[in-house]
């Protein structure tokens, strides 16, 4: 087997190449399902993908203990910021968002790792599949690491973001918006009538935090780029549609699925870690099978506001 990582020959022969998802908790992570399906479809018989429960306190020692067989890590909460600091090289998107959900080992220098943010790709693709390929304005519920990835998904000027939060917007999230020249508005959680003219709604908070959905139709969407209202993405997945998604569908608004974000951020991770094009069809089928097993009670995937899990 010969693999290429970021254009370079990584290895050949039968040496084992290890990747994993780290975070806390990760017991119900679907990342192993997706990555293992990719390895099988690509014929990478000497690659393995595991999960490991690692919190912020344990991360430095765990990371320092990785031997030369390790090629990549998928990072979920609470490691997206500490993982960024561990990397020697940080990509533009990871730097802009202050969050990394992917660490990839350099093929030429085993001591060097690069931090990536593939959540942005996942969000952009999920919105595109819902008919909103180039949003210039977003309503973002929450202001944490995944919210910063949503902010980076704005691709069309003039950029504007409305944050809907219970308390206040995190300073690092405000700093990212201002550094990008994005106009910022802040409204309290549930004040849908205070939101005007957004192309898409992205929720990065637990479903129980979203209130006032009986007033969702008061959101002013006269100028939305999608003809039937703003595209609505809830990054939570695993137990069917969330109350926000159901309310949006009742109003005829296009709904983006959290599983689409999960799938497409994972395809980008596979590409970065192996250097090979990700087998989208095989990964999509594996995800559908895992969710179907959950629906029949045989396993429980994670429903989480952090889609790297």
What does each of the following model-derived ranges do?
Residues 158-180:
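NAD(P)-binding Rossmann-fold cofactor-contacting core
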Residues 231, 235-309:
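Adenosine-phosphate binding glycine-rich loop
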Residues 23, 117-120, 127, 131-155, ...:
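Glycine-rich adenosine-cofactor-binding loop
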Residues 12-130:
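Phosphate/diphosphate ligand-binding glycine-rich loop within oxidoreductases
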Residues 16, 134-137, 229:
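Phosphate-coordination loops involved in phosphoryl transfer and adenosine-cofactor binding
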Residues 180-256:
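Rossmann-like adenosine-cofactor binding region
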Residues 156-160, 251-253:
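Conserved S-adenosyl-L-methionine
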């Amino acid at each position: 087997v010969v693999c290429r990582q970021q254009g370079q020959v990584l290895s050949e022969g039968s040496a084992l190449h290890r990747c994993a998802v780290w975070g806390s908790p990760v017991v119900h992570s679907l990342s192993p399902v997706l990555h293992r399906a990719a390895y099988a479809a690509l014929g990478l018989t000497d690659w393995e993908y595991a999960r490991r429960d690692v919190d912020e306190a344990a991360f430095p020692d765990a990371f320092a203990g990785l031997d030369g067989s390790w090629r990549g890590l998928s990072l979920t909460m609470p490691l997206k910021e500490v993982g960024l600091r561990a990397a020697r090289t940080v990509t533009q998107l990871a730097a802009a968002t202050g969050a990394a959900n992917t660490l990839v080992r350099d093929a030429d220098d085993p001591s060097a790792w690069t931090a990536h943010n593939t959540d942005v790709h996942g969000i952009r693709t999920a919105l595109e599949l819902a008919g909103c390929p180039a949003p210039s304005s977003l309503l973002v519920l929450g202001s944490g690491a995944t919210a910063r990835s949503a902010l980076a998904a704005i691709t069309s000027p003039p950029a504007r973001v409305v944050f809907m939060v219970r308390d206040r917007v995190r300073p690092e999230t405000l700093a990212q918006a201002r550094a990008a020249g994005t106009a910022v508005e802040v409204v309290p959680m549930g004040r849908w009538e205070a939101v005007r003219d957004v192309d898409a709604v992205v929720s990065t908070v637990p479903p129980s935090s979203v209130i006032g959905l009986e007033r969702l139709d008061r959101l002013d969407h006269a100028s939305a780029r999608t003809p039937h209202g703003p595209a609505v993405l809830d990054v939570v997945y695993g137990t069917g549609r969330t109350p926000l998604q159901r309310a949006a569908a009742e109003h005829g608004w296009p709904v983006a699925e959290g599983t689409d974000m999960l799938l497409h951020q994972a395809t980008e991770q596979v590409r970065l870690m192996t250097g090979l094009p990700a087998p989208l069809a095989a990964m999509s089928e594996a995800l559908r099978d895992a969710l179907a097993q959950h629906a029949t009670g045989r396993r429980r995937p994670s429903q989480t506001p952090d889609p790297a899990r």
